[in-house]
């Protein structure tokens, strides 16, 4: 079964409170989607404002206003 993503690569996002169990220290950080993952566990690779690259599920990310502009 093919996998579909709602958010494009390059979209500015904020890591929301749904990530508090897997990555509590990342909650509230802003970042940019850098890759779509072909994984059953995670959907996106995100580079945050500190330079960390972390994997997240779609419900753990909130798109920022301004769309594709990195914040």
From Swiss-Prot:
In Swiss-Prot or TrEMBL terms, this protein is called: SPbeta prophage-derived uncharacterized protein YorP
- An example of a Pfam family matching this protein is YorP
Which organism encodes this protein?
Answer: Bacillus subtilis (strain 168)
- Give disulfide pairs as residue numbers: none
């Amino acid at each position: 079964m093919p996998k579909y993503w709602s958010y494009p690569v390059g979209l500015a996002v904020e890591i929301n409170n749904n990530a508090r169990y897997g990555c509590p220290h990342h909650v509230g950080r802003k970042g940019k989607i850098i890759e779509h993952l072909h994984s059953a566990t995670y959907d996106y690779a995100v580079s945050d404002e500190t330079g960390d690259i972390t994997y997240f599920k779609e419900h753990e990310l909130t798109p920022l206003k301004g769309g594709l502009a990195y914040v």
